[in-house]
Design a protein with these regions (language model features):
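Adenine nucleotide phosphate-binding catalytic loops in nucleotide-utilizing enzymes
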Residues: 116-178
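Phosphate-binding loop of NTP-binding sites
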Residues: 1-119, 127-134, 138
Length: 178
């Protein structure tokens, strides 16, 4: 957001964490006009609210960082959450979608939008099973267990399927140092 503020002067955000429809509405209603005439918003939006919000605003960019099982009590299985997000994105087919390429969930999403990927591009080792819980995420093509040349967290990293050859997509944006 800091870089965008340097360019645009003012960026509308929801820093209080109010990320459902009422919080997003309040964020817009209480916003001050931009002095530069350029308007930009960077909003964190609840997965289940995203589709409804897209009925009212048309984002030019979606950034999807991850989906973990921390919301199972609210939304059920991880793939339910993933499909809610895809349904919302489909409402804005001209918006670019920036996905975490390190997540096997985001491999070849069934959306009409232009897609770009970001991720870690650190030193890789030989492909091996992840050291800890990958949340049951399997190869998106053949449902085999994935191996990782680089495993950054849970199911995130430079994954590869030794059964069918599926692997992390080429990254458009890379983090090369920590």
């Amino acid at each position: 957001v800091g870089i965008l503020k340097e360019i645009y002067g003012q960026v509308l955000t929801n820093p209080s964490g109010a990320n459902m429809i009422t919080g997003i509405t309040t964020t817009f209603l209480t916003a001050k006009s931009s002095k530069t005439g350029k308007n930009i918003a960077v909003l964190e939006i609840d997965e289940a609210s995203l589709s409804h919000i897209c009925d009212y605003i048309q984002p030019s960019l979606f950034v999807i960082t991850n989906i973990f099982r921390d919301q199972m009590d609210r939304y059920g299985e991880i793939y339910t959450t993933y499909n809610m997000i895809l349904d919302a994105i489909r409402k804005v087919p001209t918006a670019t979608v920036l996905l975490n390429g390190d997540s096997p969930l985001f491999y070849k999403p069934a959306i009409p939008n232009p897609v770009q990927y970001f991720g870690f591009d650190l030193e890789k080792g030989p492909a091996k099973l992840a050291h800890y819980d990958t949340e049951g995420i399997l190869c998106p093509d053949c449902q085999s267990i994935l191996k990782y040349e680089l495993n950054t967290y849970a199911n995130l990293g430079a994954y590869i399927c030794e059964n069918c050859g599926c692997k992390r997509p080429d990254l458009d944006y890379r983090l090369t140092e920590l």
